[in-house]
Amino acid sequence: MILCKTDKRNSTIKPVKRVQSNRAHRLNDEIRGVKEVRLTDENGEQAGIVSIQNALSRAEDAELDLVEISPNAEPPVCRIMNYGKFIYEKEKAAKEQKKKQKVVQVKEIKFRPGTDEGDYQIKLRNILRFLEDGDKVKITVRYRGREMAHQEIGLDVLERVKTDTSEVAIVESAPGKLEGRQAVMVIAPKKK
């Protein structure tokens, strides 16, 4: 059966091109242009080099698919398998892999040069929790008004945070110079 399409302008019939399958592997009758293949049977054992017709008949007898695994090899490598199950397990493994990957986020904690001890301890607890979760922490000390005249007080706060978190974190970017009216330091969790 040939699919056709009529062109309204010229009233001619043109054959429709078949849509190329978007599968990663060629299956069964899609494997063309080769006379012999290196065959692996459904148990994973090497069956040697066989003709394509022999490989197709063996796959049909087993009620499975003949899948071209490595088309660039000489001769191409084919395997007898349940292709639907193969794709399902491959997608399932990819999902599991994606679940295991953690996106590292940068959390920000803001201090002031005159942050009280109780507030400091709460912010330090949050910093340690973020580091345990595997996130980086951006510590910012903001200056207002005349606090700019005593920048060393804010830098002392950053130095104190650095020493208090030295067991679980490393400094990724130390506070070198002010960025506008704030000093910034980024710390990351130590590798386990």
From Swiss-Prot:
The keyword Protein biosynthesis applies. GO terms for biological process: ribosome disassembly. Its main location: cytoplasm. Pfam families: IF3_C, IF3_N. Keywords: Cytoplasm, Initiation factor, Protein biosynthesis. The keyword rRNA-binding does not apply. It comes from the Bacteria. One of its GO terms (molecular function) is translation initiation factor activity. It is found in: Cytoplasm. SUPFAM superfamilies: Translation initiation factor IF3, C-terminal domain, Translation initiation factor IF3, N-terminal domain. InterPro entries: T_IF-3_C_sf, T_IF-3_N_sf, Translation_initiation_fac3_CS, Translation_initiation_fac_3, Translation_initiation_fac_3_C, Translation_initiation_fac_3_N. One of its GO terms (cellular component) is membrane. IF-3 binds to the 30S ribosomal subunit and shifts the equilibrium between 70S ribosomes and their 50S and 30S subunits in favor of the free subunits, thus enhancing the availability of 30S subunits on which protein synthesis initiation begins. Monomer. Belongs to the IF-3 family. This is Translation initiation factor IF-3. It comes from Haemophilus ducreyi (strain 35000HP / ATCC 700724).
